[in-house]
């Protein structure tokens, strides 16, 4: 189950984010009964979370708060089910950095949603090798999502 809450006061493509999260969880072979929360917040709230949980000043674009320790299964394993956790996005920060990254605001939000989801599944980018794996997987999921929308006329 995917729950999305917009506390940001900014318009957002919530339906699109839920669709992408559903698609990504299926692609990553996470059981469809797993629970994920997506929370959209304003800059002030994101800044408070960033400082409280990361010890860093200023707002950021995305934070992930894992619940159950889950990983994508191997080919011969059953999909895991449980509480994935929360992904917190800040639409105003996302919109500002979208142009820097050559994306639309919706495209940036989608990219960051997958980034946050991968963190919930144990991926990280502290080391160069981890970063390559995580960012490659992020790009692959977004490309597959774009293809899916193209094929189903959702673009």
UniProtKB/Swiss-Prot annotation:
Give me the comment on cofactor binding.
Binds 1 zinc ion.
| Cellular component per GO, a single term | cytoplasm
Q: Which terms does the record give in the GO molecular function aspect?
A: metalloendopeptidase activity; RNA endonuclease activity; zinc ion binding
What InterPro entries does the record point to?
MetalPrtase_cat_dom_sf_prd, YbeY, YbeY_CS
Task: Return the EC number.
Answer: 3.1.-.-
By its UniProt entry, which Pfam families does this protein fall under?
YbeY
| Cofactor section | Zn(2+)
Keywords from the named record: Cytoplasm, Endonuclease, Hydrolase, Metal-binding, Nuclease, Ribosome biogenesis, rRNA processing, Zinc
Residues that coordinate or bind Zn(2+): 115, 119, 125
Checking SUPFAM superfamilies in the record gives: Metalloproteases ('zincins'), catalytic domain
Q: Which family does it belong to?
A: Belongs to the endoribonuclease YbeY family.
Q: What class of enzyme is it?
A: hydrolase
| Protein function | Single strand-specific metallo-endoribonuclease involved in late-stage 70S ribosome quality control and in maturation of the 3' terminus of the 16S rRNA.
Full protein name:
Endoribonuclease YbeY
Sequence segments annotated as region (Disordered)? 64-84
């Amino acid at each position: 189950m995917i729950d999305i809450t917009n506390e940001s006061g900014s318009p957002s493509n919530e339906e699109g984010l839920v669709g992408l999260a559903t698609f990504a969880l299926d692609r990553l072979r996470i059981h469809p009964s797993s629970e994920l929360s997506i929370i959209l917040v304003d800059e002030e709230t994101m800044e408070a979370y960033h400082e409280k949980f990361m010890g860093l000043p200023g707002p950021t674009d995305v934070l992930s708060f894992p619940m159950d320790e889950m990983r994508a299964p191997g080919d011969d394993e059953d999909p895991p089910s449980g509480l994935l956790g929360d992904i917190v996005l800040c639409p105003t920060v996302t919109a500002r950095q979208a142009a820097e990254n050559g994306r639309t605001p919706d495209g940036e939000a989608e990219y960051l949603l997958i980034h946050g989801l991968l963190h919930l599944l144990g991926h990280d980018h502290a080391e160069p090798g981890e970063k390559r794996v995580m960012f490659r997987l992020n790009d692959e999921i977004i490309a597959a999502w774009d293809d899916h929308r193209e094929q189903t006329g959702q673009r």
